[in-house]
Amino acid sequence: MFSKNQSGSSLNRQLFETYMALDNWHQFRLRLFIEGIFVGIAGGLSISLFRFLLNESEDLRIYLYYACLIPALRRDDLLPLLSYALLLIAIGGALCAMCRYAPMAGGSGIPQVKGVILGLMKMKWLRILWVKILAGAIGIGAGLSLGREGPSIQIGAVAGQGLSRTLGRTRMEERYLITSGASAGLAAAFNAPLAGMMFALEELHRNFSGAVLLPTMTSAITATIVTRCFFGNGTSFHFVDLVPLPAQYLWYVALIALICGLAGIIFNYGLLHIGAFYHPKVFRTQASKIIFALLCAGVLGFLLPQVLGGGNHLVDQLAVTNYPLVFLLLLLAAKYIFTLISYGCGAPGGFFLPLLVIGALTGAVLAHLLVNAGLLSAVYTPNVIIIGMVSLFAASVRSPITGTLLILEMTGDFDHLMVLAFASAIAYITAEILRGRPIYDALLQRSLAASPDTACEEEKNMIEVPIASGSLLENRPISELPPMKQTVIVEIKRSGKSLIPDPDTRLRAGDFLYILSESRNAETLKRMGEESNVK
């Protein structure tokens, strides 16, 4: 039985406003639709500023190397080299100070957003907004192997949170607006509105509720329109004249996806255990970690500049350049290791784009082997590179639909939908069989354990719990739900109709259960609504 002992003005206000929203469900969804447009505008403008600063900082880094540092190295002039090293140290100190000022702005930002949506973490939206834009552009621009997608998703999310706080919305509505902001963030980062919308549904909320779909769809489309006004309609990757892969090569696709599924497990393992490298006896402060990573970037700028930054230009080069196998393996190893070093230092930036680049390099290595063995024509090398990207993403993130749509939109070629979906499925199944954890779930749990100060205080929030077919909650009466204190079932939505909760009411697949509870209790019910009853 659920406790009916509820008191307090905060709880009463949540109940009243939520009842109002649920009783006027169609008006509530229309309001979310309109608010999604404003979230998309705010997120699109913020991310456009972030992308502009990032592009300028990367151009400045390239200019410094080719105009100053490389010529100085050739003439044995140490002054410019020492000056650049001091600049990197100063940048490291500044990034550390900003991360100390806004701890939730460090790292990718996606686990943090997910934690806030689940009601497990809290964000100070205005502080994170400017720190993420500035620190992300500086760190990635200085050469760290980090991506713009994580910061963009968090920037969009805090834009949605800011709108919610400005308008005084309930926590339930705020979660929808944060989700729509995250959707806008991914869409604006890569000109990929479909992937942005699907990421919010598949990864963040893990259900296809209409209340989630409407604001995420409008915000993703609006944010994409805004960013295209500044950066044009071009795709992130530029593959020219892709030839569709014949059906007889599908077993190659399965083999490549299987290998990339294994690579995804290895990538996740490295990302979760890079902390052992940054041992506290050697790296006593976060500043020392960031400075070390930046100095590594400074050295790699002379040796392997291809692995610096996100790496989308490297993917374009792989499609048109026949690199030797040894050099491809060197690039793969260097990109993987430097991505771990960059992410592990805690500087603001994601691993989404570096993950795709590592997948592209893995695909390039496999394509080289297949072509040299006479098993595949060289004309299909770009196809294998794309398959490597989508497979590694599906294995690591465990969001195969998002990965498929993202690569399709980033390449601008939808003729490969079937092949990419097939590869995503194989890689996903491989990772599931090997019992690898989805990377963002693992990072969220680690963040909650390592930084309890960022966790939410136990407050009552309205949570939407979808009931999946075959789940632990399907066909259960309300009276048989697990006992939880301070929890109230407010309403059940079934086929668009509202049902008043009754102890004898049985839950059906497709129902949406609206409960007012502490976040951790609600998360337990959400897992039961998703997990299969088959053991």
Language model: regions and residue ranges:
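A short, polar/charged loop/turn motif at coil->beta-strand junctions and beta-hairpin connectors
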Residues: 107, 134, 459, 483-486
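Interdomain regulatory linker/hinge segments that flank or connect interaction modules
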Residues: 450-460
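Alpha-helical transmembrane segments and immediately membrane-proximal extracytoplasmic
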Residues: 1-452, 469, 494-496, 510-513, ...
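A structural signal for short secondary-structure junctions
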Residues: 385-386, 396-397, 457-459, 482-484, ...
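Short glycine-/aliphatic-rich beta-strand segments at the starts of folded cytosolic domains
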Residues: 459-467
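Cytosolic Rossmann-like ligand/nucleotide-binding regulatory domains
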Residues: 468-525, 529
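A common structural junction motif
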Residues: 530-535
